[in-house]
Amino acid sequence: MKDFRAPWWLPGGNLQTIWAALFARRTRAAPPRYRRERWTTPDGDFMDLDWVEGDTAPDAPLLVLFHGLEGSSRSHYAEAFADFAAAHGMRFVVPHFRGCSGEMNLAPRAYHSGDHEEIGWILARLRGRQTGPLLAAGVSLGGNALMRWAGEMEERAADVVDAVASVCSPLDLAAGGHAIGRGFNRLVYTTMFLRSMKPKALAKLAQHPGLFDGEA
């Protein structure tokens, strides 16, 4: 693994984060063409998974990416992962957390950083369909949930996946929550997240009246 060296003209995490999201080239070729598959969850809800399979062999490695807070298969990093997978002969899939695929989920729940049971259900189902190596990665919140699953599973995780990786995940949630609620982070990142989270919360309340206090 090579050490990351930021360009001299992008000092600091904020500039690197914002520039990558707004201006970086996501793929070396055309954007990925996803095939969507819908699963019924154990609680009667649904989950959408976006696949890129191309001309890969039946036993090709499968790279599973768990996206970050309010992310999706169209996030800049997801498209970059899809491009990497295609260039290395891998199949690729993004399982969307509840409510993140562009359609509101049905159950009176969303998703969270410690959602390891959801991660385990997804990976177990993919393992049952996959003959080749199964590789799992998570970005930010998705990495938190994946690492929680790996920690809960301990040695048994190796029976399901061949490798796991966490990218830019706020593993110390208390410190991360404190940091994102202050100064520049609050002004930029919190505002960005709330732009989609508030309408989703109100839509969920309309779907399930009385679920929480919408005036709080």
Predicted regions located by residue number:
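N-terminal presequences and immediately downstream first alpha-helices
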Residues: 1-26
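Short, well-ordered amphipathic alpha-helices
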Residues: 51, 120-124, 146-153
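Alpha/beta-hydrolase active-site loop
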Residues: 109-129
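Short glycine-enriched, charge-decorated loop/helix-capping segments at active-site entrances
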Residues: 107-111, 180-182
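Alpha/beta-hydrolase-fold enzymes
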Residues: 130-216
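N-terminal cap/lid segment of alpha/beta-hydrolase-fold proteins
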Residues: 17-55
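Phosphate/oxyanion-binding active-site loops and adjacent basic polyanion-contact surfaces
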Residues: 45, 74, 112-116
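Short, surface-exposed "cap/lid" segments of acyl-processing enzymes
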Residues: 53-106, 121, 125
